[in-house]
UniProtKB/Swiss-Prot annotation:
It comes from Mus musculus. One of its GO terms (cellular component) is cytoplasm. GO terms for biological process: negative regulation of apoptotic process; positive regulation of fat cell differentiation; positive regulation of transcription by RNA polymerase II; transcription by RNA polymerase II. Pfam families: DUF498 (PF04430). Belongs to the AAMDC family. This is Mth938 domain-containing protein. Transmembrane segments: none annotated.
């Protein structure tokens, strides 16, 4: 199953191809997407994205996982999260969210089994 493209991105709003929902923050993987609710794992801008935040997407069999740190890159990504993914053989790309969406969509177009977690505000 292919990863859905990110159809649109603006401050505080993301749309994923194949979904009628608008997300503030979202997780995407081959065949699906959902809201990324930081309250589930106690995520805050610092220390940032934890392994628990990316575990669900990593378990979907992705080759690459793209992390969008926000429009102003306020969301941190500690080395422990990158190491968690790399130990599973997953290529990790950590970028400002607009750049992350471009990278993610380019990987989708190449047929890569890509997933992502994206923060669409600060």
């Amino acid at each position: 199953m292919a990863s859905p493209k990110i159809a649109s991105l603006s401050w505080g709003q993301m749309k994923v191809q194949g979904s009628t929902l608008t997300y503030k923050d979202c997780k995407v993987w081959p065949g699906g997407s959902r809201a990324w609710d930081w309250r589930e794992t106690g995520t805050e801008h610092s220390p940032g994205v934890q392994p628990a935040d990316v575990k669900e997407v990593a378990e979907k069999g992705v080759q690459t996982l793209v992390i969008g740190r926000g429009m102003s890159e306020a969301l941190k990504v500690p080395p422990s999260t990158v190491e968690y993914l790399e130990k599973q053989g997953i290529d990790v790309r950590v970028l400002q969210t607009e750049q992350a969406v471009k990278e993610y969509n380019a990987l989708v177009a190449q047929g890569v089994r890509v997933g992502g977690v994206f923060h669409s505000t600060c």
